[in-house]
Amino acid sequence: MWENKFEKESLTFDDVLLLPAESDVLPKEVDLSVQLSEGIKLNIPVISAGMDTVTESKMAISMARQGGLGVIHKNMNIEDQADEVQKVKRSENGVISNPFFLTPEESVFEAEALMGKYRISGVPIVNNKEDRQFVGIITNRDLRFIEDFSIKISDVMTKEQLVTAPVGTTLDEAEKLLQQHKIEKLPLVKEGRLEGLITIKDIEKVLEFPNSAKDEHGRLLVGAAIGIAKDTDIRAQKLVEAGVDALVIDTAHGHSKGVLEQVKHIKETFPQVTLIAGNVATAEGTKALYEAGADVVKVGIGPGSICTTRVVAGVGVPQITAVYDCATEARKHGKAIIADGGIKFSGDIIKALAAGGHAVMLGSLLAGTEESPGATEVFQGRQYKVYRGMGSLGAMESGSNDRYFQEDKAPKKFVPEGIEGRIAYKGSLQDTIYQLMGGVRSGMGYTGSRNLEALREEAQFTRMGPAGLAESHPHDVQITKESPNYSF
């Protein structure tokens, strides 16, 4: 040990480039899908970080529609986080197998509150919650001129000429019925009992977002962060009940006893849910998490733009080497890793994937988009969005202190491992993802990689020094117009 103390030399994104290779692959032909776990297939290898200025339901919905995955952060109470998951799961469906419903005796106020909370335009009405015989429907059109919201639903709901379809109706058949009768919602019934629902909005979304990442029921995929705090069991239970597809045990040091015990416990309690755990930066840490029960391991200690772990704690591994070392171990287990942090350009994404990552987790590249929950502010005439690390003082005060094993400390005693800042406003997530994936596709064309597995297995790197990095960026010219995929 002593003799080898300084033996390890590590590399990061700016130290390497991918070698171009003979190629018969065009960028538009590459396959960006990845089977992250048995239950999760993504159509792009991108996951939005579980940070309180990056991912809530709005970001997670948009990420899944683009083919990726959003991880809802945990800096909120358990009920609110479960609600955020439900918003994603109910945002669109092929067929809604467990639709919301109300009874005629409930008030119009309850119908209005339910529609407002989940942004839906109507609710089926059943005779009672046990028999669930379909008797009517109430929509936002029925509520437009109502002044007294305490009246019963039965006074305003549509009861006559109800259009229904049997269970098993396909989306194509449903679309014809919806158009024929000029309605937006088609209840699915079996012997009069409400069993499902198909809406015109869901059909339109299927056509608008054909690349969406969905579960077996046609609902958008979503993940949620949990930690190792005392309420973790209850939080995980509520998230699973809400329909979460992946639980993410999110800590600064995944190769620690408490985290490994939590991974083992959560996997034993919820074996059907994909378990992502981290963060680690060594093969040994990766092995320990897999053996504890993790399905996917998250790699990265200190590379993030808002992370100060490496300068505060003096610990970490430059990200390309960390990804490669952890991926080498992952291959032995036949499992996936996620490269989390340090990515500044689309070129860094393909480097992380070529080094062994199955997907990347992004924070700063997405924090400036319209869909992020960070506050918008104007500075020197330009729009920005607030972006902070989960190890920053503000985030720790809001609930992420257990991530850094400081849950028992008073706020004045916190030792932050992150900063708070701002990032330029970028517009829609869809445009950002388009540019990022365009860069990845271009890179795979250069390396001759038809899919991500070929990229991982066959792509080769060359090392470069500071002069090579300087040569890689625009030089000897003054940039006069911003590019949508480059700023330095």
From Swiss-Prot:
SUPFAM superfamilies: CBS-domain pair (SSF54631), Inosine monophosphate dehydrogenase (IMPDH) (SSF51412). Residues 467-488 are annotated as: Disordered. The active site is at residues 307, 403. IMP binds at residues 305, 340-342, 363-364, 387-391, 417. It catalyses: IMP + NAD(+) + H2O = XMP + NADH + H(+). Residues 95-153, 157-216 form the CBS domain. Its cofactor is K(+). K(+) binds at residues 302, 304, 307, 471-473. Its EC number is 1.1.1.205. The keyword Repeat applies. Pathway: Purine metabolism; XMP biosynthesis via de novo pathway; XMP from IMP: step 1/1. The keyword NAD applies. Gene3D superfamilies: Aldolase class I (3.20.20.70). One of its GO terms (biological process) is GMP biosynthetic process. NAD(+) binds at residues 250, 300-302. Mycophenolic acid (MPA) is a non-competitive inhibitor that prevents formation of the closed enzyme conformation by binding to the same site as the amobile flap. In contrast, mizoribine monophosphate (MZP) is a competitive inhibitor that induces the closed conformation. MPA is a potent inhibitor of mammalian IMPDHs but a poor inhibitor of the bacterial enzymes. MZP is a more potent inhibitor of bacterial IMPDH. Keywords: CBS domain, GMP biosynthesis, Metal-binding, NAD, Oxidoreductase, Potassium, Purine biosynthesis, Repeat. It is an enzyme of class 1 (oxidoreductase). Belongs to the IMPDH/GMPR family. Catalyzes the conversion of inosine 5'-phosphate (IMP) to xanthosine 5'-phosphate (XMP), the first committed and rate-limiting step in the de novo synthesis of guanine nucleotides, and therefore plays an important role in the regulation of cell growth. This is Inosine-5'-monophosphate dehydrogenase. It comes from Staphylococcus saprophyticus subsp. saprophyticus (strain ATCC 15305 / DSM 20229 / NCIMB 8711 / NCTC 7292 / S-41).
